Each structure stands twice: as C-alpha cells, then as structure tokens.
C-alpha cells in the first residue's frame, strides 16, 4: 500500500471500533459507520455493562486517556516503549479486539511513535492478553482496511449474519424486526 | 427506565447528582439514573443548570399547561446523527412517489388498528366501510386525496364512540375540545406524541422530516406520522377502558365557558393507566420474545429506517391482539 492510499484511509475515518466490527460482522460495521449506531439505545445488559466497564475500569490508574485522529486508547505506558491498552469485557471476540489494538499500534507507528505491542485486559475474567505487532500483521491490516472501505462503499448493508452471536448483539432488534 | 409526572407546583432543580423537587412543604429527591421522561402538569421554576443536567442524562421534560394542553418539550441535544440517513429521509420526501408510498403506509397501519378496535366490538357494517376505504388507499394519487380518505375513515370510526362510551361526542373538536371525550382524545394523543418523539430522538431519524403530515407543521411532524399508528392501540383502547370501567367520570372534567379540560384528578388517572399500558408486555411473533408495548414504537422506527435505506419495505405495526 502506498502513502496515497494511506492518506485516503485516514480520510475515510476508520475507527478502531470499525476495525473490530469488520472482524465481527460486516453488517454491523456498515450500520455503525453510517451513523446508525444502536449501542447507546439498546437496553441490552451486555452493552451497558461494557460501557460502564469502559468508563470506570482505569479511573484509579493515574494514566491519561490518549486520543488522536480517530483512535482512542485507554492509556499508554511509558517503559522505553509505548504500549497500547484496551479493556474488553469478554474474550468472545478476541480476534476482532486483537486487530483493533493492532490498528492503534499501526496508527501510532505512522505518527512515528515507538510502539509494537499492547495488552488487552479482560477484567471480568482477570485475564490479560499480550499482542505483538509483526511486519506480517501490517500487510494483513492493510488488507482489512481495504476490506472495510469495500464494505462501506456499498449502498446497502450486508444481509444479516444469521449466526448465534446475533442474539447478543445491540443491533439484534434492528436486524431481525 | 421510568417516567415521572409532576402535578404539584414548586421548583425542580439539580442537587449534586440527583433531582430535587422542592414543594412548599417538602423536598423530594429523585435519583436520575432510571428516569427517561418527566411530565410537568403544574407550574415549575427551573434553571439552565437543571436543563444542562437533564441533557447530560438524556432526560426529556414535557410541559402541559393548566388546561392539560401540550405546550412543548425540552429534548436533550441529539446524540445520534447520521447524514447518510438524513439524505435518505429527504429523498423520500422530495420524490412524490416515494413520499406517497410512505404516507399510505402510515394511513394503512392506522386504519388497520382502528378497524381492530371496532372488529372486537362487532361493528361489522363500519368495518366493511373501513375495508372499502382501505382499498382506496392504493389508488390515491396525492397526499390531499389520502388525507381526505383518512378523514372519512376517522369520521366513521368516531361515529361509534358515543355508543362505545355512552358519552356525548358529536364530532372531533380539537382547539378547543368541546366536550369531555374530545378533551380526553386530545390529551391522550399529546401523550402518545411525546412518547414517539422521545423514541425518534434515540434513533438517527430526523423528527422534522415527515411524509403524511407536512414537515412545515410547527411540530416535529415525523412523530405525528408515527403516532397515527399507535394512537388507536395505546390511547383509544385506554379511553374506552377508563370510561367503561367507570374509572373516569364526568367529575374528572372541568367545563369552562368555552371548552372542557381534564382536571388534575382526571389526568392522574389517565397517566397512571397510560404508563401501565406502555409497560405491558406481549410476545412478539417475529422477535420471538416478550417486549414492552412502548418498545413497539422503537421497532417501528427501525422498520422505517430499513425502508429509507432501501433494505425492506416498511410495514407498520398492525395490532394482532
Ligand atoms: S444482529 Fe447479527 S447481523 Fe445484525 S449486526 Fe448484529 S451480528 Fe450483525
């Protein structure tokens, strides 16, 4: 991918959430990206729990939340190297969360920050997963970003997934009504 | 989430992270976490600090005047915006064929639900008249034609009200309502409007762009469009029940020189039962789970969004019970 294409992607305002959704459900990605965000209005207990968790988990840590461009990072840890941290409520979508984190790392690298690793925290299961960003990841991530743009350029969202995970998704009512 | 109704005059203010209603003799503190609407039927003093707090907590404040007429709402700043959906909404308004298609759907849904109210009471002749009118919906060539068709249907519907309720009705009179039944309908419709409005604000739909009603109406007319579908089920049925069970009596109305309005006691009876109606649950056949009546509004908005996206034609909520 050349630098023109990268600029192009920035313009498309791809957020970390969108990267994660790309690996979860293309329909969800499309709806979310078009501003049809149902996360805030769903009474879905999981969604609310996730939000509260996100808002409160690291309050006592003395680290700032750092945000730039479309990226939001829970906190950065300075140990010679910068680490990206993300808090997630369950390991169900681990692959998606890993790519979300790798996207943040990539964005930091683009800014010239020395960062090649991060940690996903799962406080509810008291687990943490280390994520390392490899050169191969960069290529895969570029493919995913292009894939995201392809999904978003479609006039209609993808058909509903029809999978078991739909029942716990904030978009369930919307998709199945 | 709950709805609070304020009937006594006083001051509503923010007190740290709660709301305090200060009356002459007492102070009531309400935790904000579970409020989503506040209806105010009395004189209240309030300040911008309160409104800012309500906006932050996504709470709507609706005002009714002394006579129970709806004055307006404070609605928190839109948190959901979608330029994409807005463009589609406008497109469906500007394209006459698309607008008419949606407008017809609203009327079709309303008439289905109206018919169901009569069907249960075995008004066979009026039901077949409504069927005839419904068949004409598809042939209407303009919004005006559609509106007049709807007016015909409504007249036939309201003609049964004196018999159903045993109360004087005459014809529908709005500003001002000429008798108790009309006052009740106006009040109930205003309540329904606010419920729809709140749900619209939770989606990315723009409440000012409507299809059956003209967007130029001073109100958020999309809420008027959608309320048409729900009024027969949520409001009319409730009115029949309250009268037939003798829960509302002539004494709940004040007869002014020129018009009639619900007294505080009458409003209390109505909103209590209205609230219970909204909280009732029913097994949804498509989603295969129990959902609240009030969620039916949200689901219809989802269907409307899908229609606007071009994904699936909107089919309004048709009462099945
Ligand atoms: S309900 Fe299913 S299809 Fe719809 S967005 Fe969620 S996961 Fe995708």
UniProtKB/Swiss-Prot annotation, chain B:
Q: Which GO terms describe its biological process?
A: defense response to virus; maintenance of CRISPR repeat elements
**Which of this chain's residues are annotated to bind Mn(2+)?**
150, 213, 228
Q: Read off the InterPro entries from this record.
A: CRISPR-assoc_Cas1, CRISPR-assoc_Cas1_C, CRISPR-assoc_Cas1_HMARI/TNEAP, CRISPR-assoc_Cas1_N
Its top-level enzyme class, in one word, is hydrolase
Report the superkingdom from the record.
Bacteria
- CDD domains to which the protein is assigned, alphabetical: Cas1_I-B
Keywords of the record: Antiviral defense, DNA-binding, Endonuclease, Hydrolase, Magnesium, Manganese, Metal-binding, Nuclease
Write the Enzyme Commission number(s) for this entry. Answer: 3.1.-.-
Q: How does it assemble?
A: Homodimer, forms a heterotetramer with a Cas2 homodimer.
Q: What does this protein do?
A: CRISPR (clustered regularly interspaced short palindromic repeat), is an adaptive immune system that provides protection against mobile genetic elements (viruses, transposable elements and conjugative plasmids). CRISPR clusters contain spacers, sequences complementary to antecedent mobile elements, and target invading nucleic acids. CRISPR clusters are transcribed and processed into CRISPR RNA (crRNA). Acts as a dsDNA endonuclease. Involved in the integration of spacer DNA into the CRISPR cassette.
The protein depicted here goes by the name CRISPR-associated endonuclease Cas1 2
- The record lists the organism as Moorella thermoacetica (strain ATCC 39073 / JCM 9320)
């Amino acid at each position: 991918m050349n630098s023109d294409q990268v600029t192009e992607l920035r313009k498309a305002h791809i957020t970390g959430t969108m990267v994660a959704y790309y690996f979860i459900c293309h329909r969800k990605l499309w709806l979310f990206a078009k501003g049809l965000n149902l996360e805030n209005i769903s009474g879905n207990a999981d969604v609310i729990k996730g939000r509260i968790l996100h808002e409160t988990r690291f309050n006592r840590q003395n680290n700032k939340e750092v945000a730039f461009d479309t990226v939001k990072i829970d906190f950065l840890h300075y140990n010679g190297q910068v680490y990206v941290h993300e808090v997630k409520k369950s390991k169900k979508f681990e692959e998606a969360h890993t790519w979300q984190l790798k996207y943040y790392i990539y964005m930091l690298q683009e800014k010239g920050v020395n960062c090649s690793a991060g940690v996903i925290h799962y406080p509810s299961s008291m687990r943490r997963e280390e994520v390392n960003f490899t050169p191969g990841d960069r290529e895969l991530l570029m493919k995913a970003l292009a894939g995201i743009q392809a999904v978003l350029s479609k006039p209609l969202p993808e058909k509903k997934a029809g999978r078991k995970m739909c029942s716990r998704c904030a978009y369930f009512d919307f998709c199945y009504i | 989430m709950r709805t609070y109704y304020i009937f006594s005059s006083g001051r509503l203010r923010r007190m740290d992270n709660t709301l305090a209603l200060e009356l002459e003799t007492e102070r009531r503190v309400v935790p904000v976490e579970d409020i989503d609407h506040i209806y105010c039927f009395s004189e209240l003093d309030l300040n911008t600090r309160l409104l800012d707090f309500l906006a932050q907590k996504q709470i709507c404040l609706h005002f009714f005047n002394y006579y129970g007429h709806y004055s307006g709402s404070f609605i928190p700043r839109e948190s959901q915006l979608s330029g994409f959906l807005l463009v589609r909404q406008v497109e469906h308004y500007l394209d006459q064929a698309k607008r008419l298609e949606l407008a017809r759907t609203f009327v079709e849904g309303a008439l289905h639900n109206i018919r169901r109210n009569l069907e249960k009471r075995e008004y066979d002749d009026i039901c077949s008249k409504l069927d005839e009118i419904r068949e004409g919906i598809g042939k209407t060539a303009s919004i005006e034609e559609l509106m007049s068709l709807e007016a015909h249907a409504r007249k036939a519907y309201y003609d049964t009200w004196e018999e159903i309720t045993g109360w004087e009705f005459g014809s529908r009179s709005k500003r001002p309502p000429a008798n108790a039944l009309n006052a009740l309908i106006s009040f109930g419709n205003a309540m329904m409007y606010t419920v729809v409005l709140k749900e619209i604000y939770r989606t990315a739909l723009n409440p000012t762009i409507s299809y059956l009603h003209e967007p130029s109406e001073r109100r958020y007319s999309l809420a008027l469009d959608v309320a048409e579908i729900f009024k027969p089920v949520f409001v009319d049925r409730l009115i029949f029940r309250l009268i037939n069970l003798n829960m509302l009596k002539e004494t709940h109305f004040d007869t002014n020189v020129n018009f009639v309005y619900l007294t505080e006691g009458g409003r209390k009876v109505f909103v209590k039962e209205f609230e219970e109606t909204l909280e009732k649950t029913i097994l949804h056949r498509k989603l295969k789970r129990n959902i609240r009546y009030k969620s039916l509004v949200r689901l219809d908005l989802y269907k409307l969004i899908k229609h606007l996206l071009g994904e699936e034609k909107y089919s309004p909520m048709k009462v099945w019970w």
